[in-house]
Amino acid sequence: MAPLLLLFLLGGLCALFSLASSSPATKKCGDAKKRREEEGEEVVVVAKKRPEEEPRRPDPDADLGIVFSTFDHDGDGFITAAELEESLKRLGIAVSSAAEAAALVARVDANSDGLIDIHEFRELYDSIPKRRKSHQQHPLPSTAAADEEAAAADEEYEAEEEERDLREAFDVFDGNKDGLISAEELGTVLESLGLRQHGGRPAVAECRDMIRLVDSDGDGMVSFEEFKRMMTVVKA
């Protein structure tokens, strides 16, 4: 999988992570329940949703910051070529050499300091969908039939390319290669990326919440088809 596309997929994952792990109503209810239990009261909680509450929407700025922090290992606000190379290796994405990692950095390093800051990272992240559509095209005679044929060929090429990329991304999460992503497998990937809830290891329950957002058949797993639908939504 192209390392640049990986950044886009991580953005979708982080959006799901933030949606599943931060529900204000759930947190307030849990805090109140804990206080009353500490005071010795028997507590029965019935979850209710206030009429004025709306489902939490992903915050693009916050999600981008989470993705950035997974690569910025030392937290200094910059991504080095070495940090980029190490992050990709954690996910099983091979980088052939340090020079290749440096070349990836150089592609967006506007001030030529050898580092990627958050602004350069945003420019890279926003450009990824456009890059996917910029493959080389062979010129054809400019006729209506030729234009229609070229458009169909482009759509087919793009669909095949996206299918391959998504399959490779899916395989990163599917640790045992059974064709399904479990909560445990998702937690392992989150941990490898440094995405931890409240500074600790991602709880399996939180990973189940993430899966529930995209699990259309209710089996507690994410199939490849569900994974593709998920990525279609987060890229929209």
UniProtKB/Swiss-Prot annotation:
Organism per entry: Oryza sativa subsp. japonica (Rice)
Start and end residues of each EF-hand domain: 59-94, 96-131, 161-196, 202-236
Positions of Ca(2+) 1 binding: D72, D74, D76, E83
Keyword Calcium belongs to the record: yes
Pfam family, one: EF-hand_7
Top-level taxon: Eukaryota
Binding sites annotated in the UniProt record for Ca(2+) 3: D174, N176, D178, E185
Residues engaged in binding Ca(2+) 2: D109, N111, D113, E120
Gene symbol of the encoding locus: CML30
Keyword Metal-binding: yes
Keywords: Calcium, Metal-binding, Repeat
Name the record gives this protein: Probable calcium-binding protein CML30
Membrane-crossing residue ranges in chain numbering: none
Role summary: Potential calcium sensor.
Basic and acidic residues bias spans: 49-60
Extent of Acidic residues compositional bias: 146-158
